[in-house]
Every structure is written in C-alpha cells, then in structure tokens.
Amino acid sequence: MQIRYFLALSLLPQVVLADESPTASASQCVIEPPVPRIVSQPGLSAADQEKIRIVSDRSNAEMGKQAIFTGDVVFSQGDRHIAADEAILDQATEQFDANGNLVFQDSIFTVTADSLQAQMRSNRATLKGAQYWLHGQQVHGDAEKLQITMNNNLILTNTNFTTCPPDNVSWLLEAEKIKINSEEEWGEIWNAKLRVADIPVFYIPYMTVPVSDKRKTGFLYPSFSTSTTNGFEVSAPYYWNIAPEYDLTFTPNYMSSRGLFTKTEFRYLAGEAQSGRLNLEYLGNDQMISGSPNRYLYNWQHQGAIDKNWRVLANFTEVSDNNYFNDLKSDVNRATDNQLSRIGEVSYFERDWDISTRVQDIKVLGEDEKPYQVMPQVNFNYRAADFWNNLDFGFNSELTNFAHQDSDMNTATRLHMAPSLTLPIHGPSGSLTSQVKLMQTNYWQEKNNSGFDGLDDTVSRTIPQVRINGQINFERFTELFDQNYRQTLEPQFQYLYVGYEDQRGIGIYDTAQLQDDYFGLFRDRRFSGLDRIADANQVTLGVTTRFFDDHNQEATKFSLGQILYLQDSKLGYEDNLFEQNQSTSVLAAELDTRLSHDWYLGAAIQYDTNSSDNKKTEVTLDFRPEANKLLQLSYRYVPDLLNSNTNDLVNISQAGVRGAWPINDSLYFVGNWYYDLNESRSIETYTGFQYESCCYAIRLSYHYRIKTNYDDNIGSAVIDEREQFESGVYLNLVIKGLGGSGPLGVSDMLNDGLFNYRKPLYLRN
C-alpha cells in the first residue's frame, strides 16, 4: 500500500515562496505550527523509507474488508506522517478515511484538517477544514477544502494565506479558488481579495503566481510618487516569462501632469554565451510641453562570445529630444547622462594576435557641435613574447574612417601603425621596463569647409618614442600608534621621450586632453586619440607607501608624484592651446586609509607648484561601524572646468553628507544632501525611510534636485518655462509572499540620486 498522493501536498506552500530571498532577520519571522513535530526514525534504509507503518491504540481488520484503527493513529512512510483519532481503510474499494485531530506532516510543511478522504486507486484525496504551515518559514493559511487530483495537482477552495504572524496579520489574501499545477509549477487564483489591516484594498478576478523559484508571468510590485514636474505617478510593472531564454517586462506609468508613459524591456539569451536587452519607452502627447509632442526612447544592447575566439558587442540608444532623461525616469540612462552611445563591434582573438572592427556614433544631448562618427575602425594587434634576446615585440595598428552628419564638416581616413620592442626585467624587489616605439600615422583628409584652410589633404607623420619605467619595492616591519604594521615603500620613476612633429595640418577627430591624477603621471601621452601626439622629454618621479596590519589587510595607501619637464612641449591641442611651457606638472597625491576600525578617509589633490594653485581636490570621510550603518562626509573642488553645455569655464565647490542608519530592527533611514558653495544653494536632497516587517516592507522618500535643462528641440517651450529644481515624494510597497521582485533594499536607496555612493577606500586586501 502506498500513500504517494500525499506527496502533492508539498507543492502548496510554494505558491507564496516564489522570488522570496531570506533576510538576515528571517529566523525571527519563522512561524511554527501549533502541533508538535513527529520525528522519523533515524538511519532508515531506502527500502525502509518506502514501507508504511501503522500504529494505533486499537485496530480491527479483516482480510478484504475494512480495517479500522482508533486511538492515537499514526501512519508513517519515511519522513511523511499522518496522525488522527480514527482511520478506516476499505480494502475492497481502496478508500482511506481519517478524522479527528488530523495532522499531516513531512519535511516541508504541516497540515491540520477536520477530515481526510482518499481514493488510493486514482490517487485522489480531499482534506476539509485544512490549515497549513511551512517548516522554517512564515507562510501559513486556511482552506475550506483541499483537493489532490490524480495528476498531483492541488485545488484549494475558499482559501487564504499570509506571511504575517498569527497574532498580527497585517495582510491576508483571500481567494475563492486556487489551483496549483505541479508539472507547470504555476498557480491560478480566482476572485482574490487582498486585505490590509483587515480592510479590503483591491480585488483581482484572476491572477497567476509562480510555485517555484522559476521566473513566472505576473504583476510586480507597484510604486507611487508625486513630483513638481510630473504630478502624481503610479506604475504597475507586468512580467511575462515568454520562454527560458526570453522575458519581457511591461510597465505602464501614469503621470497626471504628462500622460501615460509606457516602458518595455525585452531580455534574451542567444546561444550559450550571448545575451541582450531591448528597451522601448514612449510618452504620447506630453501635456507639459506646448504642442504635446510624442517622446520616445529605444535602446538595444548585445554582448557575448561566438565559440572561444569571437566576441560581439552592440549598444544603440536614441531619444526624441535633449531633455528626455532630465524629464522622465528612464530605465536606460540617468538624469545626469548627456551622451548616447551607438557602438557595434566584432572581435577575433588568438593567443598572439587579435583583430576587431567597430562603428561608433556618439550623440551629445544639448550641444550643437556633433562628434565625428567612426565608420568604421579596424584594429589589428600582434604580440610576440621573448621575440629575440628577451625582447618582446608588439605591433598595434588601426584604420579609421571619420564621417560626420554635417556635410560641411571635414572628413578623413587615418592609418596608424606602431611597432615596438620591449625589454621587461622583473625581480623579487623591483622591475624595469624599457620600450622603444615608432608611431607612423597617415591621414587622407577631405576639406568640405573652406574656412579650414590650414588642413592638409594628405599627412604622413612619423614619431619615435622611448619609455623607461622602473619600480623598487622596500619592506619593513614597524609600529605606529601602538599597532604593528608591515610597511612597503615603492619608489617609481619613468623617463619618456616623444619626438616632435608639426601637426597643425591635422584635424581634430577623436582627441581630447586627459586628466592628470597620480596614475596619469605615468602615461605616455597627454591626449586621447591619435590626432595629437605631444612631444615630450620628461621624467616622472613618484612614490607609494602601504601599511598592512597583522591580518595582511591594507590599512593605508599613500601616493605622491610629479613630472619634471626637461624641455618645453611644442605641441598644443588646437593652435597653441594647452602647450606645456612649465618646468613641472601638477603635484598629484592620493590617500586611502582606515583611521580606525570604523573610520575611513579617502583624499586626492592636484596642486600646481608653479602658480601655487589648487587644481583639484576630493575628500571623503566614512564612518561605517557595521555593514548596515554609514555616515559619509565629502567635498569636491575643481576650478576652471569646461561646461559642455555653455562652453564656459566654471568652478565646482561642493560639499555633501550621505547617511544610512537603522533606527530600530524594522525602520531604516537613508539620506543625502549636497550643497554648492559657490552658488550658496542646495543641489540635491534625498530623504528616505524604509520599514520592513516579517510580512511587508514600505518605503517613503523625498527627493529634491537641480535639473540640467537643455534647449528644447521638440515642440515649443515648456509650459510656464522649465523649472530649475525638481522635488517629489515616492512610495514603494512590498507585500512579501505575493511574488514580484522581492523585498526592498537599502543599497539602491544609496544610489538613488544625482551622486552615487562610492566607498572612499580602494585598498588591495
């Protein structure tokens, strides 16, 4: 005799477990059933696990007829048990009935019921007046009738479930019927009513929920907000699990001041090592802009590998207007992003060489001047280690065609080749790398604008380069502030020689000046791209010291360096702009340190010793006593920064405070505040409170930020002109146990703003 039909009961609690992830305090939320657990005999063999054992105070059985068991009846098979006051087994019809303090238990859950009727021949069973509890979890509920079909599917009639403690049921889902398909691993719910604080809040005639950890179609958690620019907002994402390799999320977002804003995200897997994403966003007839224009976004991203050698990459974004990200909360870019990437690349890799082809078109929002398009670029690189007498040979090359959307702009084709010989010498206490390189570049330029008279039709540029880079590592044990440390001292030097050639006949296609931080002092060029290769005859001196504690954790790292120019650089970026006519570069210093167990400091400064000017300063001070507690103070100063929107030089002097702190076990606070010291105004304020209990989580936040308003290139001016600042209130609610995206987190609150949270300590542990 088998009782395998009881196995289907183990599917029931999984209805409310889909997409749940245990939290640190999950053990405090476990709800135990009110009946004691029946303990299985340990050490049973596989054969004994299948045997059925029946124990009762009294029994009356006759072969081929009814067998009656009364008084503390216990049926056991492995770790599955049925306890009842009375049980009857009709051997002729193979019907099994049990009633009176009925309890079913296995390793997954416990079910109590008034009665059980089972047909062993068809594997059907019905439990009436059922209550269930999931072991080690918080899911529990009632059912007037629980039926097990011959296919091991479940049907619950007049049922409910919750994840709240029995003495404090904050929410309860009631349903007329729930059907669980064990093979498809999904559940259907009819006439569902959600009660919050015993008050019905909404009714759903039909819904589906997952019954396993597999992705499943259904609604995700809604969110609510209100802001000065969009009005009242409500969004209700819907997730569609199309196939194992495809899914789609559709989010209708209603904004009272603008209209219906829809967002669609389609994700896919292609083969074993490729994936991609397609985003479509649309707002029809934006009511905030005169003329009510349509606003849209489409974005496609794809990356992956084709067998072991081929790599593919694609990223394409288009928006309807300059202020799209500024006005609407997109899933693709942040409000501060003003560049759209359109890149496609195919690469092939071997051990010693690689080749790639790419096209690129960067769109800068709010700027009249458009960057050049790369249509296309072919790169070929070759590497030969220990090529001859310990010398490494390298060959880098590229062929690039520069196009432009404006037919009046000049265009060009560029061929660049750079063979090199490198002698690397590595030892236990240092290294020395010497390299000679010859850079040959040819340009074929088409002058479409007569205003550029200085442009040459063809250019052949040959520039030699010599680079010697060395580092020595010293180490000692020392004591500092009554603590033992292992200290390293790492002096580093670089000599760089780059020949000079007049490059004023070459247009600017992909070149910009690079920033000078500590690591930038040891680069071999001042500009990105290849349109300008600056001559150099210079020595870079730098030193880094580190302190490691007894656990070999890096507690402090300090770096200091500067370039000594042996002769002036003759080459500028455009005409004579940015020519290097000083004896030294900025003095760059960086510090990352753990001041104590809880305090961390990060700082970086670039100081011009020639003019005694501070060129850049960044400081962050963190207090992190525990993983979920944070207080950060920050300051940033950058003078003469080019504003790409106005082409004006501006000074940045900003101070900020960011914090995340638990008020108690359930209530969490996250906030930040950034202040512009030059303009004497707040540029961003974010305050959020999150409450999380065993069965629900709710987040209420307030956001005030400065807006980056560009000139409108759709419709007419914004009604009542664009606001310089935006403020809003946001509400998110998670009811644990109803599927969706799971509990709210604190990390996303830290990054929900113009300035992402960044740890100041980048130590090599």
Swiss-Prot record:
Pfam families: LptD, LptD_N
Gene3D superfamilies in UniProt: Lipopolysaccharide (LPS) transport protein A like domain
A GO cellular-component term linked to this record: cell outer membrane
Ranges annotated as spanning the membrane: none
Database matches in InterPro entries: LipoPS_assembly_LptD, LptD, LptD_C, OstA-like_N
Location in or out of the cell: Cell outer membrane
Signal peptide: 1-18
Alphabetical keyword list: Cell outer membrane, Membrane, Signal
Alphabetical GO biological process terms: Gram-negative-bacterium-type cell outer membrane assembly; lipopolysaccharide transport
Function as written in the Swiss-Prot or TrEMBL entry: Together with LptE, is involved in the assembly of lipopolysaccharide (LPS) at the surface of the outer membrane.
Quaternary state and interactors: Component of the lipopolysaccharide transport and assembly complex. Interacts with LptE and LptA.
Family statement: Belongs to the LptD family.
Protein name: LPS-assembly protein LptD
Lineage, highest ranks first: Bacteria, Pseudomonadati, Pseudomonadota, Gammaproteobacteria, Alteromonadales
